[in-house]
Amino acid sequence: MSNRKADEKHHMSSSSLTNDRSYIRNLSNRKTSISRKVPITRTLEDPSNFVAKDGTKLVQAPLFLLVWQKEICLSIIAICFACLLSPSLRPYAEPFIFLSYKQPDGSYGKGPKDACFPIFWVIVFTAFRVIVMDYVFRPFVLNWGVRNRKVIIRFCEQGYSFFYYLCFWFLGLYIYRSSNYWSNEEKLFEDYPQYYMSPLFKAYYLIQLGFWLQQILVLHLEQRRADHWQMFAHHIVTCALIILSYGFNFLRVGNAILYIFDLSDYILSGGKMLKYLGFGKICDYLFGIFVASWVYSRHYLFSKILRVVVTNAPEIIGGFHLDVPNGYIFNKPIYIAFIILLFTLQLLIYIWFGMIVKVAYRVFSGEEATDSRSDDEGEDEEASSTNEDK
């Protein structure tokens, strides 16, 4: 009797797995039927990219969200813009699409409606990520001759990151360089409270928040890596710092830290893209530039900001003072919270620097620079997937 129950259980399990595979194959055919002439036909939204041979999911997000993320996000964006056409719905849609709290002099203040703007940009970035990966970077890497499916996915992911970090590093540099607190850490805390800002500064700050909120989602859309929890902690701390610095009127230090961190990020993403294209030697040289930029920006410049926060910030601001209607939101608990978040970020930086040192040692030993955080990009079911698609 027990053997018969075991056989029935095994049969039911096998049937369930077969049904899952059939669903994935049918959905894959619908999503990729337009590209049959390409040797690797699966688009980056194809469900087979997120499922192992035995039917196990390789990512944490629901399968339908991975497959239809572009369509879902574009539909939400279209609905928001359609609401602008309705006089009764327009007031509800405007905070998501446009900046709020414009002042008579052209500057912008702050308020609860500001929470809508970064939420909208989470949706925009999710759709933009899929579009730019699938219709810009994927055709490029295929035309380059790359046929390893995992390498194609990694190249497209890094291409999206490179594009974002490069654009917003230049934008952050422009805002930082044209300010009166450029290269002067003590001026980051002068003129407190920093309540009003230009439209460019406000858009930059809130869009950055939207990007980092979306990065938390991306962690669950991509295959988990070795440093998943470090990345998750980094994204949470980054979002908390952006929200607190914006809400408690410390805008300048937020601009400085975002600018500092974006520098090494776009160099790292660019180096990985070159590695996936086969430029091993150039990648090694670029890795040296990345290490130099990392040490300079995250261990030197960021440490200078930390020193001012710990030793001089309360004195520069004028002491602890809580007067919310007038924008003074700086008491001891808030100050301690900022210090804890900044030193948590510093701890993560040192953990990653330890990984960088390991890679640097391998490079000096004659090996190629490889990301110790990633899984093996060289092993893939390339042959079987190609045969299935022909």
From Swiss-Prot:
Keyword terms of this UniProt record: Endoplasmic reticulum, Glycoprotein, Lipid biosynthesis, Lipid metabolism, Membrane, Phosphoprotein, Transferase, Transmembrane, Transmembrane helix
Highest taxon of source: Eukaryota
Similarity comment text for this entry: Belongs to the sphingosine N-acyltransferase family.
Residue ranges crossing the lipid bilayer per the database entry: 63-83, 117-137, 155-175, 199-219, 231-251, 276-296, 336-356
Gene Ontology cellular component list: endoplasmic reticulum; endoplasmic reticulum membrane
Identification of the protein by name: Sphingosine N-acyltransferase lag1
Compartments where found: Endoplasmic reticulum membrane
Organism per entry: Schizosaccharomyces pombe (strain 972 / ATCC 24843)
Reported function: Component of the ceramide synthase complex required for C26-CoA-dependent ceramide synthesis. Facilitates ER-to-Golgi transport of GPI-anchored proteins. Involved in the aging process.
Bilayer topology term: Multi-pass membrane protein
